[in-house]
A protein has these predicted regions:
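Short C-terminal tail/terminal secondary-structure segment
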Residues: 2-7, 155, 234, 245-262
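Conserved glycine-rich cofactor-binding loop
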Residues: 15, 22-23
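Active-site helix of classical SDR
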Residues: 130, 166, 174
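Residue(s) in the substrate-gating loop at a strand-loop-helix junction
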Residues: 150
C-alpha cells in the first residue's frame, strides 16, 4: 500500500488521532499513518468496522492503533475520549478531523432538528476536538490539525444544504484557528476531497453513469480513491510542511474548476 508513498521521519512515534477512522477515507488515513510509524488512535460511530481496521494494520506489520467507538456529536464524551488518548499515548500532535456524513436531503424536508444534527455531525465536533487537544499539543511543542472538507460546496451540489453549509464553514474555521493557534506553533490546514470512491459512496450513490459524470467534470480523467487523500494529509501532518497553515488543499482532479467555467 505504501510502496509509492513518501516516508516522513518526523511522523515516527508521533501521536495521531483520526475521527471517523472505521471506514472510507478515515480507514485509509489510519493505515497510512500507522505505516509511517506513528502512534495512531481513532474513533468511529459504533464498534463496527474499527476492529477490522486495527487487524488490517497489524496484518501489514505495523503497531496496532488504539480504537474506541464514539459519537462525535456528543461533545462531552468526545472530549473525554481525546483526554484518554492523551493519557494513554501521550500528547496528540496530529489531529485529523475527518468524521462526517453526506446524507442527501431535499430542502423541503429539512427540520430544525435535522439541520442542527447535520451541523453537529459535519462541523461542530471539529472545533471542540481542536479545543480539547490544543493545550497538550502546544505544551509538547506544537502540532498539526488537518480538517477534512469537501468540494461539494464549491460546486453548489443540490440536496446537500446542511452538509455543504458545514463543509464551507470548515474553511472559515481553518483560517481563523490557524491565526489564533499559530503563536503556539500549531498549524491548521484543510484537505478538500473531490469525488472519492469509497465503500459507502459505491453502495449508496455511485453507478457507471454517475462515475462518468464525475470523470467528464474533472480535469484529470482518473478515479480518485482514499489514497489520493491520505498522501497529502501525511504531508500536512509532517514537519515537511512546517511553513504551511491556514491553507485548503484541493484533492479533486480539478472538478471544482468545472463550476467556474461552465
Amino acid at each position: 500500500m505504501m510502496s509509492n508513498t513518501t516516508i516522513y521521519p518526523s511522523l515516527k512515534d508521533r501521536v495521531v488521532f483520526i475521527s471517523g477512522g472505521s471506514s472510507g477515507i478515515g480507514a485509509e488515513l489510519v493505515r497510512s499513518f500507522a505505516a509511517q510509524g506513528a502512534r495512531v488512535a481513532f474513533c468511529g460511530l459504533s464498534a463496527d468496522g474499527g476492529p477490522a481496521v486495527v487487524e488490517s494494520v497489524v496484518a501489514a506489520g505495523h503497531a496496532a492503533p488504539y480504537f474506541e467507538p464514539c459519537d462525535v456529536r456528543d461533545v462531552a464524551a468526545y472530549q473525554a475520549l481525546l483526554g484518554r488518548v492523551g493519557e494513554k499515548l501521550g500528547a496528540i500532535r496530529v489531529l485529523v478531523n475527518n468524521a462526517g456524513r453526506d446524507d442527501r436531503h431535499a430542502m423541503e424536508d429539512v427540520t430544525s432538528a435535522y439541520w442542527d444534527d447535520r451541523i453537529s455531525l459535519n462541523l461542530k465536533h471539529y472545533f471542540f476536538a481542536i479545543q480539547a487537544v490544543a493545550p497538550g499539543m502546544a505544551a509538547a511543542g506544537g502540532g498539526s490539525v488537518i480538517n477534512m472538507g469537501s468540494v461539494s460546496w464549491m460546486r453548489g451540489r443540490p440536496n446537500l444544504a446542511g452538509y455543504t453549509t458545514a463543509k464551507a464553514g470548515i474553511l472559515g474555521l481553518t483560517r481563523t484557528l490557524a491565526r489564533e493557534l499559530g503563536a503556539r506553533n500549531i498549524r491548521v490546514n484543510a484537505i478538500v476531497p473531490g469525488a472519492i470512491v469509497t465503500e459507502r459512496q459505491t453502495a449508496l450513490h455511485r453507478d457507471p453513469a454517475a462515475d462518468q459524470q464525475f470523470l467528464d467534470a474533472q480535469c484529470l480523467k482518473i478515479r480518485l480513491d482514499p489514497g489520493h487523500v491520505a498522501r497529502p494529509t501525511l504531508f500536512l501532518a509532517a514537519d515537511d510542511s512546517d511553513g504551511m497553515t491556514g491553507q485548503h488543499v484541493l484533492v479533486d482532479a480539478g472538478i471544482a474548476q468545472q463550476s467556474v467555467i461552465s
